[in-house]
Amino acid sequence: MKLLLLLLTVTLLLAQVTPVMKCWGKSGRCRTTCKESEVYYILCKTEAKCCVDPKYVPVKPKLTDRNTSLESTSAV
């Protein structure tokens, strides 16, 4: 019985892992190196990379040419 209790205690202690620091609105994880399927966009507080699935990274909008929009308004 004592052996079973000791085995259960050791198993529970080994099963606990340290919590992973999350970033990017809980969509990313702070790691030193990202997985192949992840990208990093910002750095975490611990200078680790914030590894995020690319589908959660915002796409930069394309800038429109300001000269063409000015020409169409100045022709009035």
From Swiss-Prot:
It is found in: Secreted. One of its GO terms (biological process) is defense response to Gram-negative bacterium. Its main location: secreted. InterPro entries: Beta-defensin (IPR050544), Beta_defensin_dom (IPR025933). Keywords: Antibiotic, Antimicrobial, Defensin, Disulfide bond, Secreted, Signal. Disulfide bonds join C23-C50, C30-C44, C34-C51. Gene3D superfamilies: Antimicrobial Peptide, Beta-defensin 2, Chain A. One of its GO terms (cellular component) is extracellular region. Residues 1-15 form the signal peptide. The keyword Nucleotide-binding does not apply. Belongs to the beta-defensin family. Has antibacterial activity. This is Beta-defensin 121. The gene is DEFB121.
